[in-house]
Amino acid sequence: KESAAAKFRRQHMDSGSSSSGNSNYCNLMMKRRRMTHGRCKPVNTFVHESLDDVKAVCSQKNITCKNGQPNCYQSNSTMNITDCRETGGSKYPNCAYKTSQKQKYITVACEGNPYVPVHFDGAVLLPATPLPSLPPPHKRRLL
């Protein structure tokens, strides 16, 4: 079975390339990376940075994930990404996508040992406020 880390790489990593000037990028990549099997995945983001740079986000700014979990991290700098969004006329099995290239801060959820990205949580133009660093539980005083 595909691990969560491998699935993240398949769905979100496209190092060493970019979608610039290629409006067909998402149509090709969504198919190539098996996100149009059984249904059209409505929205997906590809990151055009090195895997090491994206893995490094797991030690950057700790923020809360959209689902409320505390294991999300935002990149310290913007990254070159491509947003793929299903178009209105898209109908399975003929999935159709709009390609938009952007520079944004990315947020990923990390887990495991080694601690690696397993979920792409979003991308924003402005950096978030990090969670306060709490001392380890045994050093916390009751307020």
Swiss-Prot record:
Annotated active site: H12 (proton acceptor), H119 (proton donor)
Region Disordered: start-end pairs: 1-21
Glycosylation-annotated residues: N62, T129, S133
Cellular component GO terms held in the UniProt record: extracellular region
Pfam families (UniProt xref): RnaseA (PF00074)
Cystine connections: C26-C84, C40-C95, C58-C110, C65-C72
The protein, known as: Brain ribonuclease
Source species: Ovis aries (Sheep)
Source organism phylogeny: Eukaryota, Metazoa, Chordata, Craniata, Vertebrata
